[in-house]
Amino acid sequence: MGAMVPPSRKSCYNFRVTEINRVLDGDTIDVTIDLGFDLYKKERVRVAGVDTPEKRTRDLEEKELGLDATAWLKDKLEGAIDGDDELSIRTELVGGVGKYGRLLGWLYIGDSNLSLNEQMITEGYAWAYDGGTKQKDFETLREIRRSFGTLIE
């Protein structure tokens, strides 16, 4: 598992999200971004630097944690969905697109300097992921969530 380092404000591309169309799972959302000059584009965004448990799986333990991660992300994005807060996406890639054609981004609500990506890991809803082999250690996520008092068993 590699270190997760979000891009600095100076070394990245910033996109302002005008609409959150759908939260697909804990690490993928569909949004509309403002390109400027009254131009908008719908994008599928892969939350960079994290991997969440899958919600579409036969593994009941993983499914439960995947549904929790999706609900957590929806809850955090609720203000941006309602238009109360602004969601911005930062990416270091030119064009920002990863190998599956999705925008790879770090999600920020309002003026926060802490990304939702980092919060997901800190609060036990995701693992850090650098593109290598995925580590699915469900018990570690459960332990972190127990310490935050957010795990319902």
PLM regions and their residue ranges:
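Small beta-barrel nucleic-acid-binding modules, primarily SNase/OB-fold domains
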Residues: M1-E153
